[in-house]
Design a protein with these regions (language model features):
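Conserved helix/coil segment N-terminal to the catalytic DExD/H
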Residues: 44-47, 92-135, 143-149
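Pre-Walker A (Motif I) flank of P-loop NTPase domains
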Residues: 32-38, 59-60, 108-110, 169, ...
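Conserved pre-motif I regulatory segment
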Residues: 1-41
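Post-DEXD/H (motif II) to motif III coupling segment of the RecA-like Helicase ATP-binding lobe
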Residues: 129-135, 142-199, 218-220
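Walker A/P-loop
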Residues: 33-52, 64
Length: 241
């Protein structure tokens, strides 16, 4: 697909006026069947990478996501844009979960969102395997890091899960991954010659400064002055002290 074609797909399906830095190369690599690790800051459009790549690749996509609320938000956003998607987690009725897998196997569902713990269930894994997914997405991939505060033990099984699924291309996404964490993600997931896309985390809209005050009244006045200056007029704000 040409750049203009990809831009058109993004615009027509999701209303994106243009792709952000790092998105196109990650989408192209995943759509070409290559493993990808994309490290982009929050708000940089990680979800768009797997959504657009999956729409280019024929066949269903299994998205591993650690939070039910996140799964629900992603499903709602996809459905709102006319894309067939469902979640199959512990808060979904058993009959609806079965229907979701039936739809995935029948080719009537583009995206199925599951938690890593569910894929430890042999029955769930068997159903996912029967769907022959063409792409496996691992969201919040830093959860695989064994020494991180977000560590989820079931993420360690995802490399084996990918093999059981027929080893589709793996697209791993995270906003939090220093070089050692990236290396662990690649190793634990068994990524093969992955494209690693890392984009800057500079936030020009965020300003950090330190000022020292020995007088409490002066400190309070400074906080009020800075708050009023930042607000640019009457409004509501939060001060962490």
């Amino acid at each position: 697909m040409t750049t203009s074609g990809l831009q058109r797909l993004a615009r027509q399906t999701f209303g994106f006026q243009q792709l952000r830095p790092g998105q196109e190369e990650a989408i192209r690599a995943a759509a070409a069947g290559r493993d990808v690790l994309a490290v982009l800051p929050t708000g940089a459009g990680k979800s768009a990478i797997y959504q657009l790549a999956a729409l280019i690749i024929p066949g269903p996509t299994v998205v591993v996501s650690p939070l039910i609320a996140l799964q629900r938000d992603q499903v709602a956003a996809l459905v709102a844009n006319g894309v067939d998607a469902a979640e199959a987690n512990s808060q979904v009725r058993a009959a609806d979960r079965r229907q979701a897998f039936d739809d995935l196997i029948a080719g009537d569902l583009e995206f199925l969102f599951v938690a890593p713990e569910q894929l430890a269930n042999p029955e769930v894994l068997e159903q996912a395997t029967a769907a022959k997914p063409s792409l496996m997405v691992v969201d919040e991939a830093h959860c695989i890091c064994s020494w991180g505060h977000d560590f989820r033990p079931d993420y360690l099984r995802l490399g084996a899960v990918a093999e059981a699924l027929g080893r589709p291309p793996i697209l791993a996404l995270t906003a939090t991954a220093a070089p050692p964490v990236r290396a662990e993600i690649v190793e634990r997931l068994g990524l093969r010659d992955p494209l690693v896309v890392v984009r800057g985390f500079d936030r020009p809209n965020i300003h950090l400064a330190v000022e020292r005050f020995t007088d409490g009244d002066a400190k309070r006045r400074a906080v009020l002055d800075r708050t009023a200056e930042a607000a640019g007029g009457p409004g509501v704000g939060i001060v962490y002290a």
